[in-house]
Regions:
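A short, compositionally biased domain-edge/stem linker segment
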Residues: 1, 134-143, 224-226, 230, ...
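Switch/communication elements of ASCE P-loop NTPase nucleotide-binding domains
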Residues: 1-58, 236-375, 382, 391
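Extended helical coiled-coil dimerization/tether regions that scaffold
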Residues: 2-5, 154, 158-287
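Short beta-strand-centered segment that lines the nucleotide-binding/catalytic pocket of NTP-utilizing
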Residues: 57-65
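Coupling/switch segment of ABC-type P-loop NTPase heads
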Residues: 68-219
């Protein structure tokens, strides 16, 4: 998304973003949205999803939005048409074609009309030419065509789970994987058990296992991931498919009994590795929105998960929007040049966003989140070992 010409994106609606346009002054590969619970983080992701799916005008959303996007090299036929029209007014606008293309580089769209399309301080334009230019651009460019970016949007909700599921359809459909985790077991059962996928996808199964163990680090190591049919306790006629993790000492362990932290890790891996493989699309074709991945993850494990995600997103030129209220995510991405941190706050009436630029901004975020030194140990106190006697500080 960041490499598809989108420069900035902001939204305004009647529900959450009432007083001002809320969003991003710039789009980076990794965009961390940090704020308290119920501050509007999920609503902002809803707006991004609606933008990418060209649904901002639907009754459900009814949002106006400001968008600034490069259009050079996109729909060149329309650009040529505008230039041909504008050449009639060349006496007012003495520029050649390359300069014209440069001038046409960005536009801002607000609601249902272009509020500014000429973005050039170096080229003087009369008001007549500006008005005529905007009129032509509105009608010839058909700006709605530029709302969408042909990106595939994938989301992981804060409320999520991976559970046993019935049946294995003969065809894989990634649309059946919902943002709360439904469909994960089914798609893995297809990849691991249907012959045509089982024979073709040995590499991806190996990649999934390697990524899983890389994120887990020294905490534990699995030698195999498998999906097997289980029989319901109530009746032998009902059966489900269950994901299993195999450890060398413990044998097969049901994912359903392994804790939600491992489920989150697997969910992320499925989105970043398996779904692009199934769709035969590069990761750069995707925009990901992950919500509160820190839930039920140990801090060190969460850092390794963030490291895995950031490496994939940056190296393969994808885009991530990550919501969090974790100071760990703030620390992790605060020095990453390919990431930005945007705070979202709510005054009781409307949400507001601000891009974090300074150290004091980061300190204010930590205070706003209510983070304490003892959170390092997820405890109410820290034991400092200074000698023969210990003391608990609170």
């Amino acid at each position: 998304m960041y490499n598809d010409g989108l420069i900035s994106l902001k939204f305004k609606n009647k529900t959450c973003f009432k007083s001002e346009y809320v969003g991003f002054d710039a789009i980076k590969p990794i965009n961390v949205i940090i704020g308290k619970n119920n501050s509007g983080k999920s609503q902002l992701l809803n707006s991004i999803e609606a933008y990418l799916n060209d649904k901002l005008g639907d009754t459900k959303y009814k949002e106006s939005f400001c968008i600034k996007k490069e259009i050079i090299g996109k729909r060149q036929e329309s650009v040529n048409q505008i230039y041909d029209e504008m050449s009639k007014y060349s006496q007012y606008l003495s520029i050649n074609r390359p300069n014209f293309d440069k001038m046409l580089g960005t536009y801002t769209f607000d609601g249902e009309k272009i509020s500014r399309i000429v973005d050039s301080k170096s080229i003087p334009l009369t008001e007549y030419v500006k008005d005529r230019y905007n009129y032509i651009a509105t009608n010839v460019l058909e700006v709605r065509k530029y709302w969408t970016t042909n990106k595939i949007f994938r989301r992981i909700n804060a409320e999520r789970d991976i559970i046993p599921e019935h049946d294995i359809p003969s065809e894989i459909n990634v649309q059946n994987i919902t943002s709360n985790g439904a469909g994960i077991t089914t798609i893995l059962s297809q990849v691991y058990n249907l012959k045509r996928y089982k024979d073709d996808d040995r590499t991806i199964r190996s990649d999934i296992l390697k990524a899983f163990n890389k994120i887990l680090g020294k905490d534990t190591s699995f030698i195999r991931i498998d999906v097997k049919r289980i029989t319901d306790d109530n009746t032998s006629l009902q059966s489900k498919w269950q994901i299993y993790l195999e450890e060398e000492q413990k044998g097969l362990v049901e994912l359903d009994n392994s804790g939600s932290g491992l489920k989150t890790i697997l969910f992320v891996i499925i989105n970043l590795l398996l779904i692009p493989k199934i769709l035969n699309k590069p990761l750069s074709s995707f925009v990901f929105a992950f919500e509160e991945l820190e839930n039920n993850l140990h801090p060190a494990l969460f850092r390794r998960l963030l490291s895995f995600i950031s490496q994939k997103i940056i190296e393969e030129k994808s885009t991530l929007f990550l919501t969090t209220h974790s100071n760990i995510a703030l620390d992790f991405f605060s020095t990453e040049k390919e990431a930005q941190i945007v705070t979202i706050t709510h005054d009781g009436n409307s949400a507001m966003t601000k891009t974090v630029m300074s150290f004091s901004d980061k300190a204010n975020i930590i205070n706003d989140l209510g983070a304490k030194a003892s959170d390092l140990l997820q405890a109410n106190g820290i034991v400092w070992v200074e000698g023969p006697s210990d003391r608990i500080y609170k």
